[in-house]
């Protein structure tokens, strides 16, 4: 798997994976723990770490992933929790960044995400939150988007 991830990274593909939902004592899970992958952990609406999130030096960044409202088959909805939902959130931010600046490499995208994240937990990068909670607006502004354009791109649909 490591060779496939390295090849994808070399071709310019930004790889994102959920850190896992096995708890603090779980070993790192792959592909999230691979150096070519952006490992994402989950937070709740109060920016607290999801209790069952995996932890470790490989965790890059956090995003909302607790009590996410999801559609179910038919016309109903349910609440769900997990680092996979946080990874989807980061995938959306990466899509916005690459739409604005498609020439960015995977490493550049990682730097944008981590440098614009808002620190949570222990000061600086840590095993729980990585660089902190991702910020789509700040990520877009950091690569040259005008604040009004970044705000429009990150605003929830009405």
Segments (PLM) and residue ranges:
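Hydrolase catalytic cores
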Residues: 13, 51, 65-146
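Secreted peptidase-domain scaffold signal
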Residues: 20, 141-158
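Residues that line or immediately flank small-molecule/substrate-binding pockets and catalytic motifs
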Residues: 41-44, 116
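Substrate-binding/access-modulating region of protease and related hydrolase catalytic domains
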Residues: 1-36, 46-49, 55, 73-81, ...
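A generic "binding-loop/recognition-motif" signal
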Residues: 45, 57, 64
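Substrate-binding/active-site groove segments that recognize
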Residues: 59-60, 135
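Structural recognition of the beta-strand scaffold that forms the well-ordered cores
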Residues: 14-18, 38-41, 60-63, 69-70
């Amino acid at each position: 798997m490591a060779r496939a991830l390295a090849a994808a990274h070399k071709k310019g593909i930004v790889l994102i994976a959920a850190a896992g939902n096995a708890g603090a004592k779980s070993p790192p899970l792959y592909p999230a723990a691979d150096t070519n992958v952006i490992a994402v952990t989950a937070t709740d609406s109060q920016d607290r770490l999801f209790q069952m999130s995996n932890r470790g030096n490989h965790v890059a960044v956090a995003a909302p992933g607790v009590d996410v409202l999801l559609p179910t088959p038919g016309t109903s909805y349910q609440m769900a929790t997990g680092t996979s939902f946080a990874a989807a959130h980061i995938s959306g931010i990466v899509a916005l960044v690459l739409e604005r600046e498609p020439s960015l490499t995977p490493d550049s995208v990682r730097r944008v995400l981590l440098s614009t994240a808002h620190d949570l937990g222990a000061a600086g990068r840590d095993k729980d939150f990585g660089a902190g909670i991702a910020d789509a607006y700040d990520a877009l502004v950091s690569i040259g988007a005008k604040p009004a354009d970044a705000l429009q791109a990150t605003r929830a649909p009405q």
